[in-house]
Amino acid sequence: GFDFETIRSDVSALKRWLETELGDEDLAELAERDRGRFRLAREVLSRPGVVEWLRLKAALSVDLVRDWRQAIDAVDPDKLLMSHAFMPPWTVVTGLDFSGVAEFSDAVSPKLYTMHWAQMVTFWGNELMAQRPELNERLLVRALISLLDMFDGTPGDPGGESLADYRYPEPDEPHPV
């Protein structure tokens, strides 16, 4: 079972931290490639309901694919079920449990197209900036793209500096992922 009250409380607390307490000093730490991941883990682990929420999402993804498998088998058991999934780190947030889904799928295919990932940076960044306009946009962008592993940090792949650098690319334009 799941502790829904703790899920509600802790996910709300994490949302409140992001919307009302997150500061530039937090963003600077989150923007660091390794240290940022530890900071994010610390924020999540200090709220056990967030981990429980992620477990719930994973269980729901397995239940959904199990139900699809049963529906397909009821009509034609020879039909294949091919599940599609975002790649990590998105699988953690979306709740996809590769091993659980694989039990009921004939294949699990990663979504390798990443054009829209940049829009996720823009969406999340705009939402946080709307809640906290005093945040440093450059630090926010660096934190988001670091946590989402969207740049190498090398001279050839330094990552963008503003939310405007992250949008759906034109067909002939390289995208920032």
Feature map (PLM): residue ranges:
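Polysaccharide-binding and catalytic clefts of secreted carbohydrate-active enzymes
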Residues: 1-176
